[in-house]
Structures are given as structure tokens and as C-alpha cells.
Amino acid sequence: MTREISLGYVPLVDAAPLIIADVLGFAEEQGLRLRLERAANWSMLRDMLDQGQVAAAQMLSVMPVARALGLGSGGSKLETPMLLSLGGQMVGVSAPVGAGLERAGHDFGFSDAAAAVQAVAALGQPLRVGVPFAHSMQALLLGDWLAGLPSGMVELRTVAPPLMPEALAEGELDAFCVGEPWGSQAVVSAGARLLLPGTAIRPAMPEKVLALRGGWCEAQPDLAGRLVRALSRAGGWLSNPRNAATAAEIVTRPSRVDVAAELVERALLGRIVTDRAGSEHVV
């Protein structure tokens, strides 16, 4: 008998296992029908899970830890039966800050975190830095990377990933750390310059997990196991570079991840264009 499971996600490249499991039949092979529910931001997705609107969700890896420590809003304990992604974050700056770095001689090498933060510090200007959520790997990475800057120089602002490019274009942010494809989209639509992948600050950091309400796995172990297997097989399919173009086309269909398929394909292949001049770096 086919069982339906509702899954919540925020439109990012690492929502791909959920989308691919649904579209290409990996869920069906496990006797599941997935009902995917898109959320505009992480607060909304958290609330959807807490209120039972979805049974499971793609989630920032730090959010269940913060919940267990009593940080942020209340709610039930969260279970995380599997990791969905490692890394995938991009650190970038607005067009004006990028121009200042270029005038100062920064090489935009996209790999040296120490050189990049020294260049940013040398500008000597306050920075409004966008992160997708207060309790996120992005916020932790930035805290590590920017730790040596003078007190008060950095103001972290929470901005939903799909809104990060718009916030840069409107002059509301000077820098950001966000998951793909929104760093690449910021290059396209806001003239941002990408400085580093998150892995240049800390390699192999857990980025997204599959989250379920506390007790769900224990109450329905067979169903939880089938869901994990479906997503794992979708992840295996996604790991094959030959599938990147097909995956990108599926993930960017209407009402899923609203960017050009080319940006998602580049992210899946680890080939990131870091400026409007077309500079490409492999991560």
C-alpha cells in the first residue's frame, strides 16, 4: 500500500534529493508518495513542521541542535535520521564592496579565507552581512571567519535565501553567506562578487539534514526507513555528474527553485562563476 508523506523544503540546490525522489520514482519504489511543500524561509518551514503541516523537512543542520539547547522558539524535539548535504555555502560581497576590494588589489582567488578577510578588514567599513537564519551553519562560518574584525564592525541580518540577491541589489546588505543557487543568482542579478566557498573556511561542515518531529521515527520506523532509503537513492543519482543537467532541469521547474537551470547545474558540478565577467572556479 502506498503511503503519502508531506515534505517541506526551502528552494535551494540541496532540496534536490527531495524533488528528485518524487519526480524520478525513488519514493515510489519504496511505496511512498511525496507531497512537497515549499516554504519561503526557515522560520516558516520550522513552523510548518511544528504545527504538523508537514511530516518531515529539509532543515539547516544547526536548527535541531539549537532546539535541543532551548535556543530560539519553542516546539517539539526534532529528530534527524539523515544528512542531506555538506557545504554548498557561498560567501560574497555587494558590487560596491567588490569594487573596493578590486581597487585595493584583492585577487579574488576564491580559496584563501585568511587573505579574503584581511582584504575586507582593510576596507575599514561597517558590514551588514546577510545570513539565512540566526541558528545556521552560515552564521557559524561567518563568526569563525570574521572573528578578528573590530567589535561592532559586523552586523548580521537574517534574510531568506531567495531574497538575498534582492537585498544586495537594493543596498540593504554589504556581504552575505548563503546556500546555492542564491550566491550565483546574486552575481547575475545584483552584480555580487563571490569571495569564498564555505569549505574554504571549514571543510565538510554539515549543511542540511532531514528533520522529523520527535517520536515520529520511533512510532513509524518502517515508514521512516523507506523515506531515508528513497532520499538516499536520489542522492546517489544526483552524485553522478552525468545527471547534473537533467537534475537541474527538474529542480528548476515552476514553483520549485526559481532560477535558471544553468545555475543549479553549475552548483551540482562544483563549477561556480564568481563575477559577471565569467570567472569560474571549481569547488
Predicted segments, located by residue:
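Inter-helical turn/loop segments and adjacent helix faces that build the functional surface
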Residues: L149-V154, E218-R226
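Short acidic loop-to-helix transition motifs that present clustered carboxylates
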Residues: N41-W42, V159-P162
